[in-house]
Amino acid sequence: MLIEDVDALKSWLAKLLEPICDADPSALANYVVALVKKDKPEKELKAFCADQLDVFLQKETSGFVDKLFESLYTKNYLPPLEPVKPEPKPLVQEKEEIKEEVFQEPAEEERDTRKKKYPSPQKSRSESSERRTREKKREDGKWRDYERYYERNELYREKYDWRRGRSKSRSKSRGLSRSRSRSRGRSKDRDPNRNVEHRERSKFKSERNDLESSYVPVSAPPPSSSEQYSSGAQSIPSTVTVIAPAHHSENTTESWSNYYNNHSSSNSFGRNPPPKRRCRDYDERGFCVLGDLCQFDHGNDPLVVDEVALPSMIPFPPPPPGLPPPPPPGMLMPPMPGPGPGPGPGPGPGPGPGPGPGHSMRLPVPQGHGQPPPSVVLPIPRPPISQSSLINSRDQPGTSAVPNLAPVGARLPPPLPQNLLYTVSERQPMYSREHGAAASERLQLGTPPPLLAARLVPPRNLMGSSIGYHTSVSSPTPLVPDTYEPDGYNPEAPSITSSGRSQYRQFFSRAQTQRPNLIGLTSGDMDANPRAANIVIQTEPPVPVSVNSNVTRVVLEPESRKRAISGLEGPLTKKPWLGKQGNNNQSKPGFLRKNHYTNTKLEVKKIPQELNNITKLNEHFSKFGTIVNIQVAFKGDPEAALIQYLTNEEARKAISSTEAVLNNRFIRVLWHRENNEQPALQSSAQILLQQQHTLSHLSQQHHSLPQHLHPQQVMVTQSSPSSVHGGIQKMMGKPQTSGAYVLNKVPVKHRLGHASTNQSDTSHLLNQTGGSSGEDCPVFSTPGHPKTIYSSSNLKAPSKLCSGSKSHDVQEVLKKKQEAMKLQQDMRKKKQEMLEKQIECQKMLISKLEKNKNMKPEERANIMKTLKELGEKISQLKDELKTSSTVSTPSKVKTKTEAQKELLDTELDLHKRLSSGEDTTELRKKLSQLQVEAARLGILPVGRGKTISSQGRGRGRGRGRGRGSLNHMVVDHRPKALPGGGFIEEEKDELLQHFSATNQASKFKDRRLQISWHKPKVPSISTETEEEEVKEEETETSDLFLHDDDDEDEDEYESRSWRR
């Protein structure tokens, strides 16, 4: 269903729902609107709404739904329309606006006529008018683009420019003088602010004119106008650059002079200030070194060049005595293009590299002419400039941060030390907008063409779109400490924010510096959006900078975007701004991931022995949660205990409690750390060595350790043995008791078996203590080292210990399981007996009821009640017996699987021992025991227990490489002997070597041997044992001489002949 005004409907619904519903009316109103918006027929929608709203409104549902749909048709939820009365004030201001624009046009015409009265000597009147026509066309196109952009961002800009106190939205006032129809359309929004703007602008203009008229160099009599600004030009040692917002196109930036020319024609008093005269230097020489601070007119489209070329173009005077010399010209500056035009490397047309046409600047800077520099002009000494006077100068009439030079509204960042220069970071080319007749005229006059403007911007990873002031100071000026401390954030005067008292927050003394050159101070930053209005001062040392060098930027920003700054003397921040280009978020503080704690155990130490019992500890620690386990005398310490809670939160409550444990402030509560939680801060070499060493579990008494063991070799463990690194076999056995010792730091020689005496000591120690501990040992297997390190003599004792302890563990596990099974059987027996007794009792009561028919009703009711209870108990017992029988079956299966796993592990160990050439006697015994156990459990078929496929010359299944004694558990009737003929008795030994060394079994010394399968006669019962012994001897003898490869080939040969 279509809704005309959703907000009005929501507010109407909220008022309607408030008295009839307990839920939040606004939320429910949103829900109702969402229901009504569904695309359904009216009847279905009504039923659907009633169904959905029944939960909230209950009885009121039907009435509310009817009222809702009625209002949707009648639209009575819409507020009554009030007749809009035209306000007289906007009309008056609109008239005033028209007057201003009409007034401005004659003013511009008058200024043009005045310019025509004073033509320059080298220019004709026709050329001047031609140039003005071209400039006017360009300006019109320029402002069309500018206004088109600002139409989209008007609301965003108006919201912040007013608060930030920039230039009261320069684009709006500029739009008033440029587009009459557009201004009339939007005049209602801006009219209340117009009088303030006009008053401030006229005040600003008058102050500026006063300053300009009063300017006279100190060291010379008042010269003519041309001498005045030409001589002042040569004494300019530093530059200040203001960058236009990043979104402006190539032809949008304006100089201060242009800004004030455009907007000074009308003011609140309705009078026009006298027009400015043309700048003679600019007309004759093609540039003016005063730039936008010149009190004479440079026209609507002045020449723009970069200040970085000043040192090479104008020979500056030497610094006053006592000051360091300026850096050599051109340092850290890109090479400037020559006078001839040429294609630049960037995407835009124009000569040479430089900032792109999308971001241009206004910087009138002179070309070099080779004339000698004039005398140094020093201003009258003044007190140091404070930051408040620099920033708030516009709001204080009659004051100027830079006397006789800067317009009062120029908000300058504080100057920086000499050795901090700028780099040019834009890479797009830009071309001068002066071409055609004016350019050819300049070439004829011998004046150099305009240079390119280089735009200084912060790296893109610094602040995203936050582009602002970039100040370059190249004057040799000393630092004067500043005593100004900024107060809280003032949007009219944002202060420098830094992590400490940075050395850059120091200002210059007017008595010790030359007059600063404020060439090209434009208003391009004044009405950018607030993200583009942050002032950034980027400084770099005057040496070639690498990416990792310390680079400092001072940021003037609102409080919400402040960042700490590292000084040159301090370390870089965690994420330096010059780190990864293109990542705008990298200077933001990172967020720590929340650790998910799982520890539930607490260690309690220094408990008095009389208090270290379960009752006392439970009395205190049960206040904080459910205790799962309490161990007193933990790790054999009579003053320690271990408390385990159900959850980590409960343990945290206990450890963070301020209450004294057992009213004793000396008792300490700590988190219990398991062995695997210890930080593994080991290098890869240490980890490799740790994989090689033996983890052997010794007895609980520390005094039983031999004296030759270093104390560091003993480490107390509390956790059960866990899996060891990569190559060490997983340990299986009973959990380790607290207080057991582990030989964890055995020297390398002991581990690798180089020193047999030390190894024998260790093995002796293991033999002494390992048997009683019942713990298992890891198998020596390290694939990272050659097998030659291990000798069977050095490893015999530990291997014996391992095999013995493992079989002992298996027996203990089986014993425990048998005991558990026995207990289950006893319980089942008792339940069965109880069931039988209850059934007998039930039968007795039933017979009693049948016999005594004349029984009282009360007794009858009691007997019936008892019978009912007995029936319930009987059924319950039967269910329990059924479940116990089903549970007992899986336990048997589990036992089988464990036994099978143990059997497979033992076979794997045997393979490894055989491949490394170790003694396998103990392991074979253990394997035979496990096979018997497996046969008893039904894992292996009785009489088919040949699982040692690795020994001897196994056929078919998993043939191994080992050579050892055979344990025949399977009767194999395949023939294993070959009767041979065609040789003499003396050649028997050679024949055996021939069989073992070559595969040519049928030929021997160029003779063909007679070989056939040996078919033994069926022996009688009495001689069966003897024949088996003979067979074993034959096989063992042949195994001694046969190698692995021949064994495989022979098997293949045999299998082929067997198929025949």
UniProtKB/Swiss-Prot annotation:
Ranges of biased composition (kind: Basic and acidic residues): 84-102, 124-143, 186-211
Region (Disordered): 80-143, 160-278, 319-416, 572-594, 754-775, 943-982, 1014-1060
Compositional bias segments (type: Acidic residues): 1024-1037, 1044-1053
Extent of Low complexity compositional bias: 225-235, 255-268
Phosphothreonine PTM sites in chain numbering: T447
Compartment(s) of residence: Cytoplasm; Nucleus speckle
Composition bias type Basic residues, residue spans: 165-185
Positions bearing Omega-N-methylarginine: R455
GO molecular function (one): zinc ion binding
Annotated RRM domain residues: 600-674
Listed Pro residues bias regions: 319-356, 371-384
Record's keyword terms, sorted: Coiled coil, Cytoplasm, Metal-binding, Methylation, Nucleus, Phosphoprotein, RNA-binding, Zinc, Zinc-finger
Skewed-composition ranges (Polar residues): 387-402, 755-770
Zinc finger (C3H1-type): 273-301
SUPFAM superfamilies: RNA-binding domain, RBD
Coiled coil stretches, renumbered: 810-887
Modified residues (Phosphoserine): S928, S1012, S1020
Annotated function: May be involved in the turnover of nuclear polyadenylated (pA+) RNA.
Protein name stated in the entry: RNA-binding protein 27
Upper taxonomic lineage: Eukaryota, Metazoa, Chordata, Craniata, Vertebrata
